[in-house]
């Protein structure tokens, strides 16, 4: 009887480990369905920073989706080039790549801002290769250079695909798809165990500290 119990326990443990192994660094790119049946007009920016014929708002959203579609694995690393180039990344890289391909090079922009306004940032030694990949620095940068929007999630019409949302220690891009309450999903990269890159998390978070739009 003891042998049977041990065998059953071993099988159960193996099953749990297998599930965990399948979840680790296997974040899904499958997009959730838009569940909102109401009508919220989409916002389109009047700016096209990179001159590609696509407005900033649409560009940022499309680029965020294109970036996570490459299925980056979660790991915090330092890069001499600033932008990750090896298939790894963190939450700030979703935003950095989304903006870079829309005409906004955060590496250059944040570094220039830190050097011009050091009093805004709590940084002893600026480092262009990493400063733009820190949430706290992006919070300062966007607060001064982006369009500030509401942090009230219930004002659903003011949350638009391509917006930027900052939490206390996390950042993401607002999706153009919404849950049944009209609250948009978030495109983000939080940890190696994350089930999907696009998730219904906005209503569940109590630590929203910023909501921005790159241009109007």
Tell what function each PLM region has.
Residues 22-139:
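N-terminal capping segments
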Residues 182-216:
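Low-complexity, Gly/Ser/Thr/Pro-rich intrinsically disordered linker/tail segments
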Residues 54, 115-193:
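...with weaker cross-activation on analogous glycine-rich loops/strands in unrelated enzymes
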Residues 1-12, 20:
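N-terminal Sec-pathway targeting helices
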